[in-house]
A protein has these predicted regions:
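His-Asp phosphorelay/catalytic-motif detector in bacterial-type signaling
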Residues: 45, 72-77
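Conserved phosphotransfer microenvironments
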Residues: 37, 47-71
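Alpha4 helix (beta4-alpha4-beta5 surface) of REC/receiver domains from two-component response regulators
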Residues: 58-62, 85-100
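Short hydrophobic patches on amphipathic alpha-helices
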Residues: 41-42
């Protein structure tokens, strides 16, 4: 059975990249959602959540906090993909218990 990996990406630019990278690995199913659809992601309790920070307009720390405070997703792994190299920004994101 495939593990659902939700990719939060408002312009859907990273979905094809992840699907191509894992095309030979049928264990993972990548599902793209927009930030306004976060409730769908939380309701389905995914195996992993990947957030493309460069494609969303929402504050990444508050989005991660929303995921972490959801009772069913407190331990769901979160990976943030970002081009932001600011050290303080990384620390702020890591404080929300995510991988950067």
């Amino acid at each position: 059975m495939a593990q659902d990996i939700y990719v939060i990406d408002d312009d859907e630019s990273s979905i094809p990249i992840f699907r191509e990278l894992f095309k030979n690995d049928k264990e993972f199913k990548f599902i793209g959602v927009r930030t306004e659809q976060i409730d769908i992601t939380l309701k389905n309790i995914p195996f992993l959540i990947i957030i493309n920070e460069d494609s969303i307009d929402r504050d990444i720390a508050s989005l991660c906090k929303q995921i972490r405070t959801d009772e069913d997703n407190q331990i769901t792994p979160i990976i943030v993909v970002s081009s932001n190299t600011d050290k303080y920004h990384k620390l702020e994101v890591l404080e929300q218990s995510v991988e950067y």
